[in-house]
Regions:
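Active-site neighborhoods and metal-handling regions in enzymes and metal-associated proteins
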Residues: 1-462
Length: 462
């Protein structure tokens, strides 16, 4: 946990922003894999962690704004339960460590909420993303499950986004720790991978590093020779000479702050000419985008700039043609880059995504596009000091998508389908780093990690 005063001040700020009513923040429950006592690793809700800090299941945090009081509802472990789990600190001591003096049994929550409803208090809660949260809220509010979806509090969402978007110095330190562990995971992948090993073997080594550092993965590792499939995970496929490996991974610290880095490397230790040409295009787009990071710059503009650089690079290879800006405005580049340039990062890898992209990544002036590729951009609004963002351009050659576009000569004035044939099986290349926006620009997070094609080859050659 952070210092007690950090949690106290966070809740005061939230109380002031919301103004009145009752804020209900649900912690997560344990989740069973296949029977009650065989559990998935517990992961606390990120907003509960941000305001209440206690990493324990089945807790509910209440901020009663009108009465200026805070309550945690939950139960201590029984002696019988601790035979199986080991000692668990009493909840009143944990609550005291984050500045909450009132602790009540979970069973008292129903009468508390019923009284709040009878007094016509405004009850603020976040959209639930787990079925058990959904059912609990419906039960507490005395409404049907079907009617709950329209009842969540937009004012609470906006208030939480406004707080969690700006990372404090202690949060940056924690994120930097996560990125350092993530860099160690990537270094292991680049140096250990050999033809004949499986993707899963490498992913297992990476997870070992994350757990050994005191945390876990911040998301399931993407370690694949099919990098054109954006979230392909890993398999038991053998690493094969001539292929590229796209490695996108993240570590999470013990306090659940995330890292997220991507590197692409050749199984054969050196890139082929075609692979290196495309890799250098991606790397140039990455550097060009990073140079634009600064407060006030809409991230959508950074994304579109990177798209233009990717397009210009493909034009030099003869794969694309025409005016680069026009090609991007028409969405021709999305055949090769059908996703966004990056996202916010913090307690979640895609920070606060459960609260809604329209609130986290957009604003009243900048709305989500419906265009293929651009509609997948998670962050578009102007950057501000204290934001933590990823920058992750890539080029992806998906044969199924290429065939579909070519069959219709889709945007054929910008794409040379004949030249593209030489690249259709290249798979995918992505380079990703994490940045904090500073007063005058940005700063890369984490220890240095090989990034250029030459640096990658030096590591591969050992």
């Amino acid at each position: 946990m952070f210092d007690k005063n950090i949690y106290v001040e966070r809740r005061k700020q939230l109380q002031h922003a919301v103004g009145s009513g009752l804020v209900v923040l649900l912690g997560n429950e344990e989740s069973s894999m296949n029977y009650k006592d065989n559990l998935y690793p517990f992961r606390q809700d990120s907003s509960f962690l941000y305001f209440f800090g206690i990493d324990r299941p089945a807790l509910i945090g209440i901020i009663d704004i009108d009465n200026d009081s805070e309550i945690i509802f939950g139960d201590d472990f029984t002696t019988e339960e601790m035979i199986w789990t080991g000692y668990r600190e009493p909840l009143n001591l944990l609550s005291d460590s984050i500045g909450v003096s009132i602790v009540k049994p979970r069973k008292d929550l129903w009468s508390f909420m019923r009284l709040a409803t009878e007094h016509k208090k405004t009850i603020h809660f976040l959209p639930p993303y787990r079925p058990e949260q959904h059912d609990l809220l419906a039960d507490l509010l005395g409404v049907s499950s079907g009617s709950l979806s329209g009842m969540f509090s937009i004012s609470l969402i906006k208030a939480i986004v406004a707080q969690r978007s700006y990372k404090s110095a202690v949060e940056i330190e924690e994120i930097n720790r996560a990125v350092n562990t993530t860099a160690a995971m990537q270094l292991a992948a680049i140096t250990l991978a050999k033809a004949g090993m499986t993707e899963a073997q490498i992913a297992g080594k990476m997870q070992e590093i994350a757990i050994g550092a005191g945390g876990n993965l911040s998301f399931p590792t993407i370690l694949t020779q099919q990098g054109q499939i954006l979230h392909n995970g890993y398999s038991h496929s053998l690493l094969t000479a001539g292929n590229l490996v796209l490695s996108d991974c993240g570590a999470e610290t013990g306090m659940h702050y995330a890292g997220d880095l991507t590197r692409t490397f050749p199984v054969s230790n050196t890139f082929t000419t075609i692979q290196r040409d495309v890799y250098d295009i991606v790397l140039h787009a990455h550097g060009s985008a990073v140079a634009l990071l600064q407060p006030g710059k809409p991230f959508r503009d950074v994304h579109l700039h990177a798209c233009e650089k990717l397009t210009e690079g493909l034009q030099e290879l003869g794969v694309m043609k025409g005016d680069a800006k026009e090609a991007v405005s028409m969405g021709a580049h999305a055949l090769f880059f059908p996703c966004g340039l990056g996202h916010m990062m913090g307690l979640d890898t895609h920070d606060m995504e459960n609260l809604g992209e329209q609130y986290v990544g957009y604003n009243d002036e900048i709305k989500k596009s419906t265009q293929f590729g651009l509609k997948s951009l998670r962050l578009a609004k102007p950057l501000e000091e204290g934001f933590v963002v990823t920058v992750e351009p890539g080029l992806y050659f998906n044969p199924a998508l290429i065939d579909e576009w070519e069959a219709n000569n889709q945007l054929g004035s910008f794409i040379n389908y004949e030249k593209l044939k030489a690249y259709r099986n290249l798979t995918g290349i992505r380079v990703e780093e994490d940045f904090v926006i500073t007063q005058n620009g940005s700063r890369v997070l984490g220890n240095p990690l090989a990034k250029t094609a030459n640096e990658i080859e030096v590591l591969r050659l050992g």
